[in-house]
């Protein structure tokens, strides 16, 4: 295969990260036809099965038609309210407040009162038990089409949980920077294999308040189109120029990098002060995994910086739970800014920034999250320390490794069974985030209610949180789920899928054993 000029210096970096020469095609990218290409030898097996199957045409048409019908009925009901033929339960502005700026835009207000109110019983369900694979929902009923709810049960607090929290509070006290916070930061740095780390009390603010400290005017941010809202907000607050590349598309990213290097800033054409590439390890709504080796190769080639959000991947992927850097076997030092949260795998709250010591020292004095926010609470800090030590095996057991292995097995089993049934599934085979496409708004609501009737709690997401034709249910697989639990959910999924005609996939799925499964390692007895 002839080497093209567009390959440039990209191939040495790719080869260094484990990509072989025969995998490289035109413009330095893989020959394979998948939408997102194929990764390194270490993780190529999981990227070759990362499909984004499109909905059949009739499903897309019916989805648009469904939104059109409910919108038409919404305007009709607004008319009936205006003439007094239907009671209006929505809060009304006082006459003397008519000149005030409205809290909601016209469309948002219309959508809330006519569409969301009819189905809001499927969201914000009150949970009255501890987090776990099985939980209790408080029963509630509505006599006015979800404008108000009557709660039928009491919320019972767990006395043992309160006592354990009080004991931790007495043990570590409430000083701003206690030794427990320093212990956690050192533990995070060791876990990730970097020089230093810094923790924050809120995961969302870890992104939104730190990005403005890293870049500003005269800088360029290249952001994946499916990045989390916290990353988008942080980019906007920074004042930097923002350009969005197609999801996990290396051709789109390199095209923007080339243009940024060659053309510079608009009008003046001066070089950008910094170019920051912002990606996620596992994308929360798609379940896809970033093509990290290729992003690192492009970052090195064009002298850019890389910001990696591992909120959903840290503690979930990799042989020892160290995230996508371990999954792809890349050097953590190649990622300039490593961000993650403690709300998923560690069962707590807050987030962290990790990397070189100079970076962390700079953020301690320039980050709004560090200067103006309060420190992480001692109970949450202790919870994270114990969870991380369990994953690292520092508690003297192999329980952490067992859970990571169990999560990988559960993820692959759950995904493969759903594909066999005929559901359209997004994301990577190693991703515990499993989106099941439902498409039509009426079926989204019916799916959530039918699953709850079978005592299965699910999270459904629709427009405007997703594209109008890509409403979905999002399952997050846990290591605590047993095979019997998964089979129970799958049986209900199969039944409801047939009932509501949700099996849209036109692909025939034939499960094959993975001969290179990295999760098949022996645990110490």
What kind of region is each of these model predictions?
Residues 225-233, 359, 469:
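Short, glycine/polar-rich helix-capping loops at beta-to-alpha or helix-loop-helix junctions
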Residues 116-118, 290, 358, 378-429, ...:
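Conserved PLP-dependent catalytic core of the aminotransferase class-I/II
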Residues 1-22, 27, 48-51, 55, ...:
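PLP-dependent enzyme catalytic core of the Aspartate aminotransferase-like
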Residues 243-308:
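Active-site phosphate-binding strand-loop segment of PLP-dependent enzymes
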Residues 185-209, 245:
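Short loop-beta-helix segment that forms the pyridoxal 5′-phosphate
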Residues 13-19, 23-31, 35-176:
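Conserved N-terminal helix/loop that builds the PLP phosphate-binding region
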Residues 320, 326-362:
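Active-site PLP attachment segment
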Residues 210-229:
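Conserved PLP-anchoring active-site segment centered on the Schiff-base-forming lysine
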């Amino acid at each position: 295969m002839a080497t093209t000029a567009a390959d440039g210096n990209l191939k040495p970096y790719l080869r260094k990260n484990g990509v072989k020469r025969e995998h490289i095609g035109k413009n330095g990218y893989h020959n394979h036809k998948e939408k997102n290409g194929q990764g390194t030898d270490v993780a190529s097996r999981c990227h070759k099965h990362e499909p984004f199957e499109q909905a059949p045409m009739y499903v897309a048409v019916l989805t648009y038609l469904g939104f059109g019908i409910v919108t038409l009925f919404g305007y009709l009901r607004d008319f009936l309210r205006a003439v007094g033929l239907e009671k209006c339960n929505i809060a009304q502005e006082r006459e003397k407040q008519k000149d005030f700026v409205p809290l909601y835009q016209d469309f948002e207000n219309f959508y809330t009162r006519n569409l969301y109110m009819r189905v809001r019983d499927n969201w914000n369900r009150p949970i009255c038990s501890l987090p776990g694979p099985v939980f209790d929902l408080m029963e509630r009923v509505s006599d006015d089409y979800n404008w108000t709810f009557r709660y039928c049960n009491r919320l019972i607090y767990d006395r043992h949980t309160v006592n354990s929290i009080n004991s931790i509070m007495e043990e570590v006290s409430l000083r701003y920077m206690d030794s427990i916070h320093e212990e956690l930061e050192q533990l995070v740095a060791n876990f990730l294999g970097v020089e230093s780390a810094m923790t924050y009390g809120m995961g969302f603010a870890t992104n939104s308040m730190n990005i403005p400290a890293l870049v500003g005017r005269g800088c360029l941010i290249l952001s994946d189109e499916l990045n989390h809202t916290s990353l988008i907000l942080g980019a906007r607050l920074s004042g930097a120029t923002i350009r969005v590349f197609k999801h996990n598309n290396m051709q789109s990213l390199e095209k923007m990098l080339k243009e940024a290097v060659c053309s510079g800033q608009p009008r003046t054409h001066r070089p950008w002060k910094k170019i920051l590439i912002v990606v996620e390890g596992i994308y929360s709504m798609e379940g896809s995994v970033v093509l990290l080796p290729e992003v690192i190769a492009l970052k090195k080639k064009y002298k850019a910086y890389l910001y990696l959000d591992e909120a959903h991947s840290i503690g979930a992927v990799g042989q020892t739970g160290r995230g996508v850097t371990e999954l792809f076997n890349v050097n953590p030092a190649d990622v300039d800014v490593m961000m993650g949260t403690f709300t998923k795998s560690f069962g707590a709250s807050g987030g962290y920034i990790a990397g070189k010591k100079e970076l962390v020292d700079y953020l301690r004095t320039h980050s709004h999250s560090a200067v103006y926010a309060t420190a992480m609470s001692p109970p949450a800090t202790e919870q994270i320390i114990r969870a991380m030590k369990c994953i690292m095996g520092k508690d003297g057991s192999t329980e952490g490794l067992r859970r990571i292995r169990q999560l990988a097995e559960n993820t692959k089993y759950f995904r493969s069974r759903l594909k066999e049934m005929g559901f359209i599934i997004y994301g990577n085979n190693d991703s515990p985030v499993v989106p099941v496409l439902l498409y039509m708004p009426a079926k989204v609501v019916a799916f959530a209610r039918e699953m709850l009737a079978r005592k299965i709690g699910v999270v459904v997401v629709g427009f405007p949180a997703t594209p109008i034709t890509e409403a979905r249910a999002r399952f997050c697989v846990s290591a605590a789920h047993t095979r019997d639990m998964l089979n129970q959910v799958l049986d209900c999924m199969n039944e409801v899928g047939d009932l509501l005609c949700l099996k849209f996939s036109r692909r025939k799925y034939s499960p094959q054993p993975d001969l290179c499964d990295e999760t098949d390692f022996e645990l110490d007895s």
